[in-house]
Amino acid sequence: MSESELQLVARRIRSFPDFPIPGVLFRDISPLLKDPDSFRASIRLLAGHLKSTHGGKIDYIAGLDSRGFLFGPSLAQELGVGCVLIRKRGKLPGPTVSASYSLEYGKAELEIQKDALEPGQKVVIVDDLLATGGTMCAACELLSQLRAEVVECVSLVELTSLKGREKLGPVPFFSLLQYE
């Protein structure tokens, strides 16, 4: 991983204390999205990791609603594979499968179209940030319902103090930037 590219990405992450509630330090990726060089570097770094780890053995990138959609298609293009979308409940047409997960204030559900993947296809799940791991864990469950193989989960940012990586169990996880 090129240190200068990683520094370029890291410099574009802003921190906002006490947002959205007191005691939370929010990591904002908006400056990264505004800067084409930084965004391109983030995609190159994630793709470089996946190429070195999995070679050509990835069939699809699965982007998580909603900020995973910002990285999923570009990452898929860089790898020469397709991209599928995992959406919040009620956002996809046609037959879907769903998985629910807990939020601090209730439950939520993710869905994917039933015909999005074939059994045995190798998939990498991408999101902008891993916090508690609930969303990414639900996405893994969803893809297992389709009998796809989740070969890895990746994100731009990981909030290590929330231990989301542990929720993923045996599924490998990679992040470009780690914050407490």
Curated annotation (Swiss-Prot):
Broad class of where this protein is predominantly found: cytoplasm
- Taxonomically, what lineage is the organism? Eukaryota, Metazoa, Chordata, Craniata, Vertebrata
- Keyword presence, Cytoplasm: yes
Give the protein's recorded name.
Adenine phosphoribosyltransferase
Its GO CC terms? cytoplasm; cytosol
UniProt-annotated location(s): Cytoplasm
Catalytic activity reads: AMP + diphosphate = 5-phospho-alpha-D-ribose 1-diphosphate + adenine
Native source species: Rattus norvegicus
Per the record, the domain of life is Eukaryota
Q: Name one GO biological process term.
A: IMP salvage
Q: Which GO terms describe its molecular function?
A: adenine binding; adenine phosphoribosyltransferase activity; AMP binding
- UniProt modified residues of type Phosphotyrosine: Y60
Chain positions found as N-acetylserine: S2
Q: Assembly and interactions?
A: Homodimer.
CDD domains the record matches: PRTases_typeI
Q: Give the first-level EC class, as a single word.
A: transferase
